[in-house]
């Protein structure tokens, strides 16, 4: 592959800009919820949640295919197509006259973002030499982490000019990035693979979408409602169907073979669990500030800016720490910090305003967690998988991230939806949301311990093998040990 290998810095800027846009729109809309709700008064809280989940669900499903599409048709081509779709859909979101046209435009926007995310990483991996690749990926992932965390404060500033600007801001950045990409990036050679499993991707949409639908309907209908139970059954069918097809199809929607690499499989599970808590955090805190404390969208956005500031600093250092300690210990520390921040809010926050001693310390702790986890887990694609699997591995890891985000948003709606609609000052529902965040963080930490154990065992095996290679041998048939990935 020839991806402007002589201009790796330019490739890093272009791919990071695209990843910034795709990730930003996962979270920037949270802060615009009150303003959009004011314009679309006929929609209830559960319906409004589809402005978020239509994006994340489709994002997750198309991500599963994006790497394979890029392998078949060329990474540069798919990257540019995805960026164009995303930019046009952003403009359509701003022009939407009512809720469901906005949801439709967000769905298309999610398709574009899904095409951009894994191709940007694979273009980056192939532009940088192996010895500098981990640092480049760390920078790329850090930009995504910063974008995710900057969503609320940036959204708050943009909402002052109208909620449409949370979408319009993407248009000039998207156009500039497209022009630069067309001039700098070089096309890769298309791989002779079969047609990707579009039906499998549809089953993934069906499974995740039905589960999210069931969860957001619970506040209004209850767990025993027929529509909720049917949606749960459909969700189970969709998930089982995509797994079966992925095992049998020549070019599956989900490349499950990469999960045979223990480090990658565990990192993927940790990404799913943590993303559930992270996406839930960004939504529940906006709801808390705007409903319980009665802050404006602008004040809420600025009030949540401390966490992103921590992410900016920590994400830049996370790679260096992970090189010395390993991905597992760093990610586990991040999960514990995120859990501590969520528990701090449960302990300290109530109906009265308590920013500096209540909200702020929790932001600092959760920001530390986000900055440590997202960059380090993203780097596992390049460190644990062989080169030919980078595209599909990146797609699967990001699919887990978006599925986790969709479930986190749906669970927050389940926890707080009824009370937000009927009693804005009700704290019990908000506290349930914080408890959900703490549970997601604790689950992530437990998974991180497993990742640490696998890394430790692998490092011991590698050290022992290196010692054997250096030892004198009189056997002419000596064969150097190989650290196997399970994908050879």
Residue ranges and their predicted role:
Residues 9-31, 224-231, 238, 250-459:
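12-transmembrane solute porter fold
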Residues 20, 50-57, 84, 138-146, ...:
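Transmembrane alpha-helical cores of Major Facilitator Superfamily
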Residues 32-61, 104, 298-302:
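Extracellular/periplasmic helix-loop-helix junction of adjacent transmembrane segments
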Residues 35, 67-68, 72, 156-157, ...:
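Membrane-interface helix termini in secondary transporters
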Residues 45-46, 130-140, 297-298, 387-396:
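Loop-to-transmembrane helix entry/capping segments in MFS-fold secondary transporters
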Residues 53-67, 117-121, 305-317:
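Central cavity-lining transmembrane alpha-helices of secondary-active solute carriers
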Residues 71-199, 387:
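Helix-loop-helix hairpins in multi-pass membrane proteins, especially solute transporters
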Residues 160-270, 277, 295, 302-305, ...:
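Hydrophobic transmembrane-helix bundles of small-molecule transporters
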